[in-house]
C-alpha cells in the first residue's frame, strides 16, 4: 500500500455532483498540483485537514471546474491513509479529464473495492463492517437497508467480541485446570461448564436463526391470490397495489395467466401473484393458465383463497371439495358489500390452520385486517431490530462454531479430559477470527472486494 490510488466514487452518468477520491502517501502532493486559488496553486502546507476549500481544479493553465476540495490526514480518514476528495459538477466527461490528469501526476487507477480494502488492512473496519458497506450500497428495500446499517455500526462485530470474550474465559478456566491440576484449587463443576457452553452455543443458534428469517424476507415472500373466476382476485390485486394492474371484467376467464408485482409491507418486499380463475373448461389456453395457477398456489408462502360470498350457496360442498387447499390458507370472503343473507363463518371451524376474513374490494372494508393476517401468517414480518443479517460466509463460520461446541459438549459428557476438549474451543475461537478477519484471509478478501464498485 505504498502507492496512491484514485477513482470516481459517485455513480456513473450525469449528476449534480461528481466526486473523485484519492488515497495514499502522495495524495496531498498530487492534489496540490491542481488546486488553484487567488492566482496561484496551493502548496501542501496551505491545505488544512477536514476543511472545505473552494477553488479551481486547473491543469496547467487550463481551468477545468470550480470545485470543493477536502483533505483527511492519516490516520483519521476512511482508509486510514491520507485521503483527498474533489467535488466537481457531475459531468462524466469532465470527471474523466480530471481523473486522467491525476493519473498522469502519479496516482494509479483503484481496483474494485480497494479503498475499503485499505480501510480493512489499516484496521479502520473489520471484515463484517466491510461486507455491511457492500450490502448497504446494494440494498433493495428499507428492511435490508436497516439491517445493513446495523452491521455498518458494528452489530456483528459486537456479537463476535462478546462471543470471543466468553470462549476465552472458558478456555482460561480449562487451561488453569490443566496447568495447576496438582494445586489445591477449586474449579467450576462439569455441569456449570456444560451450561456455559450451552449458553454460548444458544447465542450462535439464535443469531443464525434470526439471519435465516431476515434472508427469507429479503428474498421476497410470494403471496398468491387463488379462486374461481369472478371472485375478485384481480380487484384485490389492484387494491393491494394501489393501482390498476390487473384487468377487471365480469366475463369469466379474463385472466389467462398469472400476473406478479412487487409490493412493500413495512419496508419488506413481497411478490404478489394474481392467478387465472380455477374452473372446468375446454379452452386449451385457459387450461394452461389454470395449471399454472395450481402450481403457484402450491408453492406460495401465503395463500389467499377468494370466494364470492354473495353467490356461494352450498358451503359444505365447497368445504369438502376444497379442504386440502383451504388448510393453511387465508379464506377471503369477498363482496360483503352486496351480501343479501348472512353466512356462517363457523362452518370452517374444523379446517386446519385456516384464517377466515370478510372484505369488500369495492369499499375497502376489511383490507387492513387482511394485511395484518398476511403478517401473522408469515410469522416473520416485523421491525429490523428483531433480525440480524449474516452474509453467507459469516453464517458458515457461525455454523462451524456451533459444531465445535457440540463436539465439546459430547467430549465433556464422555468424560474426556480438558486437554482434549479445549482443542474444540480453540477451533471455535479460530472461526471467530475468520468472521471478523483477524486471521490471514487473502482469498476471502479477494472475493468480498470484487463485488464493490471501483470508487469504494
Swiss-Prot record:
One Pfam family recorded for the sequence: MMR_HSR1
Binding positions (GTP): 230-235, 249-255, 274-277
Annotated TrmE-type G domain residues: 220-379
Keywords of this entry: Cytoplasm, GTP-binding, Hydrolase, Magnesium, Metal-binding, Nucleotide-binding, Potassium, tRNA processing
The keyword Nucleotide-binding is assigned to this record: yes
Cofactor(s) recorded in Swiss-Prot or TrEMBL: K(+)
Manner of cofactor binding, per the entry note: Binds 1 potassium ion per subunit.
GO MF assignments: GTP binding; GTPase activity; metal ion binding
Residues bound to (6S)-5-formyl-5,6,7,8-tetrahydrofolate: 21, 85, 124, 456
Gene Ontology CC terms, in alphabetical order: cytosol
Subcellular location: Cytoplasm
E.C. numbers: 3.6.-.-
InterPro entries for this protein: G_TrmE, GTP-bd, GTP-bd_TrmE_N, GTPase_MnmE, MnmE_dom2, MnmE_helical, P-loop_NTPase, Small_GTP-bd
HAMAP family per UniProt: GTPase_MnmE
Family: Belongs to the TRAFAC class TrmE-Era-EngA-EngB-Septin-like GTPase superfamily. TrmE GTPase family.
Name listed for the protein in its UniProt record: tRNA modification GTPase MnmE
Organism: Leptospira interrogans serogroup Icterohaemorrhagiae serovar copenhageni (strain Fiocruz L1-130)
Amino acid at each position: 500500500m505504498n502507492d496512491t490510488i484514485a477513482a470516481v466514487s459517485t455513480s456513473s452518468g450525469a449528476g449534480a455532483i461528481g466526486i473523485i477520491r484519492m488515497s495514499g502517501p502522495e495524495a496531498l502532493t498530487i492534489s496540490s498540483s491542481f488546486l488553484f486559488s487567488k492566482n496561484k496553486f496551493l502548496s501542501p502546507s496551505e491545505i488544512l485537514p477536514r476543511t472545505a476549500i473552494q477553488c479551481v481544479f486547473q491543469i496547467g493553465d487550463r481551468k477545468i471546474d470550480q470545485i470543493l476540495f477536502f483533505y483527511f490526514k492519516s490516520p483519521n480518514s476512511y482508509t486510514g491513509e491520507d485521503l483527498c476528495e474533489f467535488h466537481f459538477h457531475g459531468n462524466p466527461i469532465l470527471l474523466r479529464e480530471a481523473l486522467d490528469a491525476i493519473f498522469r501526476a502519479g496516482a494509479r487507477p483503484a481496483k474494485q473495492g480497494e479503498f475499503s480494502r485499505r480501510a480493512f488492512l489499516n484496521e479502520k473496519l473489520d471484515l463484517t463492517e466491510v461486507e455491511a458497506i457492500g450490502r448497504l450500497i446494494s440494498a433493495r428495500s428499507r428492511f435490508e437497508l436497516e439491517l445493513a446499517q446495523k452491521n455498518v455500526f458494528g452489530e456483528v462485530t459486537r456479537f463476535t467480541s462478546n462471543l470471543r470474550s466468553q470462549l476465552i474465559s472458558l478456555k482460561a478456566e480449562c487451561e488453569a485446570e490443566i496447568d495447576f491440576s496438582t494445586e489445591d484449587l477449586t474449579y467450576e463443576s462439569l455441569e456449570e461448564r456444560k451450561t456455559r457452553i450451552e449458553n454460548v452455543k444458544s447465542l450462535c443458534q439464535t443469531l443464525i436463526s434470526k439471519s435465516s428469517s431476515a434472508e427469507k424476507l429479503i428474498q421476497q415472500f410470494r403471496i398468491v391470490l387463488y379462486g374461481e373466476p369472478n371472485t375478485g382476485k384481480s380487484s384485490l390485486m389492484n387494491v393491494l397495489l394501489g393501482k390498476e394492474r390487473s384487468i377487471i371484467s365480469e366475463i369469466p376467464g379474463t385472466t389467462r395467466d398469472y400476473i406478479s408485482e412487487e409490493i412493500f409491507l413495512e419496508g419488506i418486499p413481497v411478490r404478489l401473484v394474481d392467478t387465472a380463475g380455477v374452473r372446468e373448461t375446454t379452452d386449451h389456453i385457459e387450461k394452461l393458465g389454470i395449471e399454472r395457477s395450481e402450481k403457484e398456489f402450491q408453492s406460495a408462502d401465503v395463500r389467499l383463497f377468494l370466494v364470492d360470498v354473495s353467490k356461494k350457496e352450498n358451503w359444505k360442498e365447497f368445504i369438502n371439495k376444497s379442504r386440502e387447499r383451504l388448510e393453511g390458507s387465508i379464506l377471503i370472503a369477498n363482496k360483503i358489500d352486496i351480501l343479501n343473507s348472512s353466512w356462517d363463518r363457523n362452518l370452517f371451524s374444523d379446517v386446519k390452520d385456516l384464517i377466515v376474513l370478510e372484505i369488500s374490494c369495492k369499499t375497502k372494508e376489511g383490507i387492513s385486517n387482511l394485511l395484518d393476517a398476511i403478517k401473522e401468517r408469515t410469522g416473520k414480518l416485523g421491525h429490523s431490530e428483531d433480525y440480524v443479517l449474516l452474509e453467507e460466509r459469516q453464517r458458515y463460520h457461525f455454523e462451524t462454531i456451533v459444531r465445535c461446541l457440540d463436539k465439546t459438549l459430547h467430549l465433556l459428557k464422555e468424560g474426556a479430559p480438558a486437554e482434549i476438549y479445549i482443542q474444540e474451543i480453540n477451533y471455535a475461537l479460530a472461526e471467530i477470527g475468520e468472521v471478523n478477519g483477524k486471521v490471514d484471509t487473502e482469498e476471502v478478501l479477494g472475493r468480498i472486494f470484487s463485488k464493490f464498485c471501483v470508487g469504494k
